[in-house]
Structures are given as structure tokens and as C-alpha cells.
Amino acid sequence: MSAAVRLLGAALVAFSGWATGWWLTEKKRRRLAALEQLERLIALAQDEIVYRAAPLSEILALLKARRDMPGLCLEECGQLEEFSCPPDLDRPAWDQLEGFFTRLGSAAGQEEARHCAYYLKRCALLREGARQEYEQAKQLYTKAGLCCGVLAALMLF
């Protein structure tokens, strides 16, 4: 009886190691998804500003109506200039992109188009870095978590 309980405990410890690795991988995936959605948001805002010269309130209404960016919590946003950090995005990445929203609408014409293009490139670079991190995490974290869990189980057993 005692051996079965110990074996079950060891299996639970090994599983918790794997689950921790999976959770860390999932966190990287959600960060990548948030950056992809932000990149899409910036591209859509740029198109609306450049081609239609739409006001920011109309752009926000259009983005809310799309409902294909759930990770950005656009429903809670009253004005596009007050958009805050999405929950799945880390603070350093947001600090690099926050200027897009705070300065949005402060310039006109070509200056606004350059502003959008700059942040679109910056977001693309962040997304590419996040994609590489996610690919590495996918290959490493769950396996390393399982190995650490098994090692901890062996030490306890």
C-alpha cells in the first residue's frame, strides 16, 4: 500500500513538473498572440488613417465591431489614445508600443502615416522575437519540466 501511494506521489510530482513547463510555454504563446493582434490593430488603424482619414472614435468603433482581437480587451477601452497594456503582454514590450496610442491623432496627414509605419515595424520586430521565444519554449519547457519533475520524484522516492 505504501509503495503505491509513494508511486502515485512520484507521478504527481512528475506531472506537476510537466504542467509547469506547459504553463510557461502557454504564457509565451499568449504573448505572441497578443503581439500579433496588436500588429493587426496598428495596421488597421494605419489603413483607416491613411486611406479614409477616419477620426479615432470611428476607428475604435470599427475595431470593437471586428471582435477578432479578444486578447486586447478593446471592449473596455473608451478612447484609442487611452488603450492600456493587454493582460498577456509583458511590460517591456508594452513600453515600446505604448507611444503609438499616446501620440495617436496628435499629427496630421503624412506625419501620422509615418507614425503608424514606425510602430508597425517595431511591433513586427517584437512579434518575430516572441515567435522565436515561443518556438524555443515549445521545444524545451515541457520536456525540461517533465525531466525536473521526474528528478524531483526520484529524489523524494
Which role does the model predict for each range below?
Residues M1-A19, R30-A34, P86-L97, A137, ...:
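Membrane-targeting and insertion segments and their boundary/processing signals
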Residues G105-C148:
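Membrane-interface, cytosolic juxtamembrane amphipathic helix immediately N-terminal to a transmembrane helix
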Residues E36, R40-A43, D95-G99, Y118-K121, ...:
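Generic structural signal for well-ordered, non-membrane alpha-helices
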Residues A45-E48, A53-Q110, R114-A117:
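Glycine- and small-hydrophobic-enriched helix-loop-helix hairpins
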Residues S2-E76:
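Juxtamembrane/interface alpha-helical elements of multi-pass membrane proteins
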Residues G149-F157:
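Juxtamembrane "helix exit" motif at the C-terminal ends of alpha-helical transmembrane segments
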Residues R6, R29-R31, R40, R52, ...:
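Arginine residue identity/basic-tract feature
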Residues V13, T20-W23, A34, L44, ...:
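Sparse, context-dependent recognition of short Cys/His-centered cofactor- or disulfide-binding micro-motifs
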